[in-house]
Amino acid sequence: MAAAPWLYLSRRRSSTQTSLRRFLICSSSFDADEFISSQSRVIGGRGEEEVRFSGALFSRMIHSSTYHPYRQIPLPHSSVQLLDASLGCRGFSSGSSNVSDGCDEEVESECDNDEETGVSCVESSTNPEEVERVCKVIDELFALDRNMEAVLDEMKLDLSHDLIVEVLERFRHARKPAFRFFCWAAERQGFAHASRTYNSMMSILAKTRQFETMVSVLEEMGTKGLLTMETFTIAMKAFAAAKERKKAVGIFELMKKYKFKIGVETINCLLDSLGRAKLGKEAQVLFDKLKERFTPNMMTYTVLLNGWCRVRNLIEAARIWNDMIDHGLKPDIVAHNVMLEGLLRSMKKSDAIKLFHVMKSKGPCPNVRSYTIMIRDFCKQSSMETAIEYFDDMVDSGLQPDAAVYTCLITGFGTQKKLDTVYELLKEMQEKGHPPDGKTYNALIKLMANQKMPEHGTRIYNKMIQNEIEPSIHTFNMIMKSYFVARNYEMGRAVWDEMIKKGICPDDNSYTVLIRGLISEGKSREACRYLEEMLDKGMKTPLIDYNKFAADFHRGGQPEIFEELAQRAKFSGKFAAAEIFARWAQMTRRRCKQRFMED
């Protein structure tokens, strides 16, 4: 029996070092010595060699490419059957066939580690049935605009902080019902919110950018003596993510007001939040203003480095790196990995390879994360042979590959439609004791969606449930979208129903996918109901084809629907959407008037 491609590639480990060295030499666009210089410095009383970067060289544009994408191989029929055998499970529809007892050792995966997936788990002793009962009341009565609070009063709940946190977690994408429940609980006799429940509500307000309410809640916590460092961190990250630099810095003043110490960890948190929001320049300005008031540590320089790398400013990144060394700090593996990612993000692939080579020869030795960064980039560029060489080199170095590395390879081979190789990788993951995680499952679901194979995505989902891996909101959104794209509207709605049944709160993307699918199906009235639900919950107005959506009601001569939507949008602060709906209402009224005159 012929060996699978993955096994064939894995057996070539004896020649890995030679091939890797050859690849490094052949791909050089200029000498590594010119790019990275070493000089002897005394660090911490020891004479050691430090890697320094020539910032001027980063300004050059390197046109040569180190990648040689291979021709895609058509998907063999046997590969589909192989995956089907391993993933054959019941779909969302109750009328589907029974679960198959195929190979349990096969699972699926993905390599998208920049994406937020997953639902945070809350450790608690609360009865899940009680949480479900409360959430059902909130969901149903809020949607009907009924007196939710009165019904909650009648339930005679034994309120606990665990219960409040779990209910808020379920409504973390729907700030209005979450906040109403939070306020109702605050008024119950014998119950008082704690720092934990306040911070849960703060997180929801921060995520939905309800900054005025968020600050009011923060100040209320201050008057009750319930503020924690987590509270300030939530607020700082929220303002930074919204690119509100001045307001983010203003949190320092609130910390002073409530007698909280502003130390290096707090400043690092703010600098990191600004950097992640691609405000590297603003983070640098803030650091320059504050650097005389505190002692920067390794993390301080690393978050500044990351901020510049995220905006692809390698000249400033090199300056921070060298400044770190000048202040007696030796860049650790985290800093090296940040620089590796920065070089790859800035399309300096050959330079990243050189830095990786220097790390191997002079330290710090690459860790699993270092190899994952390199392998992920090779996979994105379809350079799978090189990705395998790096994987083999990692194993030869004594490092144990984790699920993230396998996920990158699975995504790379899956994109090339080499599902037989994907199968072997999944099998090896199980054999090596690194079972697929949630991101791994999401990766293969994404591959199936991209290849317009939603049924396979459903099988993967069922395998995920079978292996007790909790699906994320992203999991459902991908499968639902793939069905709507395939015009299988019944299954698209079935995915939505499954998500609600699982107790997962739909986010903005979930509603957008569903509303677009319903409009495409010609069910604009049903889409209108979900749009109203979004507005009532205080969620963002979805990016949909409003003209197509409105045209159905316009033809039917129903201006009152637009007027109702305009009113709801305006009440929710969605003024742009309100204006669109109001304009369509006027157009529809004029059309109705013309018809009446003609009759």
From Swiss-Prot:
<feature type="repeat" description="PPR 3">
    <location>
        <begin position="263"/>
        <end position="293"/>
    </location>
</feature>
<feature type="transit peptide" description="Mitochondrion">
    <location>
        <begin position="1"/>
        <end position="99"/>
    </location>
</feature>
<keyword id="KW-0809">Transit peptide</keyword>
<comment type="similarity">
    <text>Belongs to the PPR family. P subfamily.</text>
</comment>
<dbReference type="Pfam" id="PF17177">
    <property type="entry name" value="PPR_long"/>
</dbReference>
<feature type="repeat" description="PPR 2">
    <location>
        <begin position="230"/>
        <end position="262"/>
    </location>
</feature>
<feature type="repeat" description="PPR 8">
    <location>
        <begin position="437"/>
        <end position="471"/>
    </location>
</feature>
<feature type="repeat" description="PPR 1">
    <location>
        <begin position="194"/>
        <end position="228"/>
    </location>
</feature>
<feature type="repeat" description="PPR 4">
    <location>
        <begin position="297"/>
        <end position="331"/>
    </location>
</feature>
<keyword id="KW-0496">Mitochondrion</keyword>
<dbReference type="Pfam" id="PF13041">
    <property type="entry name" value="PPR_2"/>
</dbReference>
<feature type="repeat" description="PPR 7">
    <location>
        <begin position="402"/>
        <end position="436"/>
    </location>
</feature>
<feature type="repeat" description="PPR 5">
    <location>
        <begin position="332"/>
        <end position="366"/>
    </location>
</feature>
<keyword id="KW-0677">Repeat</keyword>
<dbReference type="InterPro" id="IPR002885">
    <property type="entry name" value="Pentatricopeptide_rpt"/>
</dbReference>
<feature type="repeat" description="PPR 6">
    <location>
        <begin position="367"/>
        <end position="401"/>
    </location>
</feature>
<feature type="repeat" description="PPR 10">
    <location>
        <begin position="507"/>
        <end position="541"/>
    </location>
</feature>
<protein>
    <recommendedName>
        <fullName>Pentatricopeptide repeat-containing protein At3g62540, mitochondrial</fullName>
    </recommendedName>
</protein>
<feature type="repeat" description="PPR 9">
    <location>
        <begin position="472"/>
        <end position="506"/>
    </location>
</feature>
<dbReference type="InterPro" id="IPR033443">
    <property type="entry name" value="PROP1-like_PPR_dom"/>
</dbReference>
<dbReference type="Pfam" id="PF01535">
    <property type="entry name" value="PPR"/>
</dbReference>
<dbReference type="InterPro" id="IPR011990">
    <property type="entry name" value="TPR-like_helical_dom_sf"/>
</dbReference>
<dbReference type="GO" id="GO:0005739">
    <property type="term" value="C:mitochondrion"/>
</dbReference>
